[in-house]
A protein has these predicted regions:
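Residues immediately C-terminal
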Residues: 49, 68-69
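Phosphate/oxyanion-binding active-site loops and adjacent basic polyanion-contact surfaces
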Residues: 2-3, 70-74
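Non-catalytic, compositionally simple segments
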Residues: 21, 72-217
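Walker B catalytic acidic pair
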Residues: 62-65
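Inter-Walker segment of RecA-like/P-loop motor cores
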Residues: 2-59
């Protein structure tokens, strides 16, 4: 679905196509779909059992319809895509320099202008809400607890099951967004179909599909 949106944007944007090089644009292959915009690349992969996509690397991961992705495949395969730094060699050099400077008592001034470039790899979990027992709901609750902790060590220790909080953990790097039907721009969805669903389907299913709520069975 995401790749189809990319194709639509590309096909309907003549100015975008004009400012991109000849290698840019969407491409569908047997085992993947790739969208290139100059030096940037988006790769869409079919998960399967996870074996054929092992070893992939990514700066940013979007796991769409997360409730339908087997938890073990996400945690053992997909999440590992972002385990390596976006520029591992430069990152190793920078950390080594900072460590040595600290030993020598030399202060290294932060480069505020490059804060966006220094951001760690990102993972986005998205999709339609599902039942409360699903791992999507589990992740949502965990991330919400992290955000509500406001960095309090005691509360974070509870989130981590009583274990110490990792040294490089930053609660500010987590966010959650809930977008129910009522917050969408008017006309974005067929209002009559939404009304029909609200009148005919189970309230729990309606809340999952249109209310962005995890439902208990």
């Amino acid at each position: 679905v995401l790749f189809e949106y990319m194709e639509t944007i590309w096909n309907n944007s003549p100015i975008l196509r004009d400012i991109c090089d000849g290698n840019s644009g969407p491409r569908r292959d047997v085992d993947r779909c790739v969208m290139r915009i100059n030096d940037s690349r988006v790769t869409c992969l079919p998960l399967g059992d996870g074996q054929k996509i092992r070893g992939q690397r990514a700066n940013d991961i979007i796991s769409d319809e997360f409730a339908s992705i087997p938890r073990d495949i996400f945690e053992t395969v997909v999440a590992g895509f972002a385990a390596v730094s976006s520029d591992p060699i430069e990152n190793v050099k920078r950390l080594a320099a900072e460590k040595k400077a600290k030993e020598l008592g030399v202060e290294i001034q932060d480069k505020d202008d490059n804060k966006l470039e220094d951001k760690d790899n990102q993972i986005i979990l998205s999709g339609t809400a599902y039942y409360d027992f699903n791992h999507f709901a589990t992740y949502w609750k965990r991330w919400k607890s992290i955000i509500k902790s406001q960095g309090d060590p005691t509360k974070l220790r509870e989130v981590f099951g009583g274990e110490d909080v990792p040294d490089n953990f930053d609660w500010k790097e987590y966010s959650i967004m809930r977008i129910p039907y009522e917050l969408l721009p008017e006309g974005f969805m067929d209002a009559s179909q939404v009304a029909r669903s609200k009148a005919t389907v189970h309230a729990g299913i309606y809340q999952m599909e249109f209310g962005a709520c995890f439902t208990r069975d």
